[in-house]
Swiss-Prot record:
One of its GO terms (biological process) is translation. The keyword tRNA-binding applies. The keyword Oxidoreductase does not apply. Part of the 30S ribosomal subunit. Contacts proteins S8 and S17. May interact with IF1 in the 30S initiation complex. It comes from the Bacteria. GO terms for molecular function: rRNA binding; structural constituent of ribosome; tRNA binding. PANTHER family: 30S RIBOSOMAL PROTEIN S12 FAMILY MEMBER. This is Small ribosomal subunit protein uS12. GO terms for cellular component: small ribosomal subunit. Keywords: Methylation, Ribonucleoprotein, Ribosomal protein, RNA-binding, rRNA-binding, tRNA-binding. With S4 and S5 plays an important role in translational accuracy.
Length: 124
């Protein structure tokens, strides 16, 4: 523990908080244009073909985003809304596509957790 004299000589250094989603530039979501749509395999214990796409944001950043839900209509040059939040078993993927916003449609025939996938309320 430092003495008062040491603290007067040199103050304590504040720890800077590093952003988990730097490309969003402190915004909740950002708009971007899809550059490439492809599939990737997850890390070791899991096995699947995860749908991802490369997006160029309006601020110039470029990053890989995950497309959640079953089936999608994301195409090259499509305008997408992107939110933060990584995918645990996909290294380098730190963003999610917002389903049901801009050029990305919601998940069809989704009954539960509809708000997360932009699905319309089913007819009673």
């Amino acid at each position: 523990m430092p003495t008062i004299t040491q603290l007067i000589r040199k103050q304590r250094v504040k720890k800077s908080v590093k952003s988990k989603a730097p490309a969003l530039a402190a915004s909740p979501q950002k708009r971007g244009v899809c550059k490439r749509v492809y599939t990737t395999t997850p890390r070791k214990p899991n096995s699947a073909m995860r749908k991802v796409c490369t997006v160029v944001f309006t601020n110039g950043y470029e990053c890989i985003c995950y497309i959640g839900g079953e089936g999608h209509n994301v195409q090259e040059h499509g305008v997408l809304l992107v939110k933060g939040g990584g995918v645990k078993d996909l290294p380098g993927v730190k963003y999610h596509i917002v389903r049901g916003a801009l050029d990305c449609s919601g998940v069809k025939d989704r009954k539960q957790a509809r708000s997360k996938y932009g699905a319309a309320r089913p007819k009673a």
